């Protein structure tokens, strides 16, 4: 069977996208039924927050559908597999955000719209995930600065270490690593 892996990925993506569409519809319909027919109505702010949650989740579903939906020709043969929805990275974060939105919408339908305050966790999560990237970016900027000064980072660190050693022990001569190793070996064998 030719392209079995691609066909398997296409079927997997189609299944996941169908599940996402069904879950999105069910959660939103349940919200409307529970909030307007079973419980009291919503304030303007609550409607705004619900609209934000629903529209952002729907937008991400649309983007994932565009990127991952398999495309077939008229005969039914696979033309485009689509992006893997189970891969790590931005796709994973988009799916997680959709699940998070659905959970909050469902909980807001059951309890109170104050549950939407948990959306404040999203920027905290973004900062948590972006901190290592920011640290790496700052290190790269530092390396670029060193390159602009025509000093590689290792050479600059060695110079700083040598200056530190010279200031720390001015009376003792600075020994190379090889000399230090030879002295340790000599001291080891000279002891009876």
Swiss-Prot record:
Membrane topology: Multi-pass membrane protein
InterPro entries reported for this sequence: SND2/TMEM208
Record field: compositional bias (Low complexity): 151-167
Residue stretches of biased makeup (Basic residues): 178-192
The protein, known as: SRP-independent targeting protein 2 homolog
Species: Schizosaccharomyces pombe (strain 972 / ATCC 24843)
Keyword Lipid biosynthesis in record: no
Region named Disordered: 149-192
Family stated for the protein in its record: Belongs to the TMEM208 family.
Main location, first listed in the record: endoplasmic reticulum
Purpose: May function in a SRP (signal recognition particle) and GET (guided entry of tail-anchored proteins) independent pathway for targeting a broad range of substrate proteins to the endoplasmic reticulum. Has a role in meiosis.
The keyword Endoplasmic reticulum is annotated on this UniProt entry: yes
């Amino acid at each position: 069977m030719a392209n079995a892996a691609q066909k398997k990925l296409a079927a997997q993506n189609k299944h996941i996208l169908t599940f996402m569409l069904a879950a999105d519809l069910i959660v939103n319909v349940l919200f409307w039924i529970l909030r307007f027919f079973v419980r009291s109505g919503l304030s303007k702010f609550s409607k705004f927050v619900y609209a934000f949650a629903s529209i952002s989740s729907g937008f991400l579903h649309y983007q994932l559908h565009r990127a991952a939906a398999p495309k077939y020709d008229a005969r039914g043969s696979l033309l485009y597999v689509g992006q893997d929805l189970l891969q790590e990275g931005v796709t994973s974060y988009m799916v997680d955000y959709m699940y998070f939105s659905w959970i909050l919408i469902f909980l807001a339908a059951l309890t109170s719209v104050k549950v939407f305050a948990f959306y404040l966790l999203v920027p905290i999560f973004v900062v948590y995930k972006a901190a290592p990237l920011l640290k790496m970016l700052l290190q790269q900027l530092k390396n670029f600065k060193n390159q602009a000064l025509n000093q590689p980072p290792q050479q600059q660190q060695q110079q700083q270490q040598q200056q530190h050693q010279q200031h720390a022990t001015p009376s003792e001569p600075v020994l190379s690593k090889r000399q230090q190793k030879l002295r340790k070996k000599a001291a080891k064998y000279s002891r009876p």
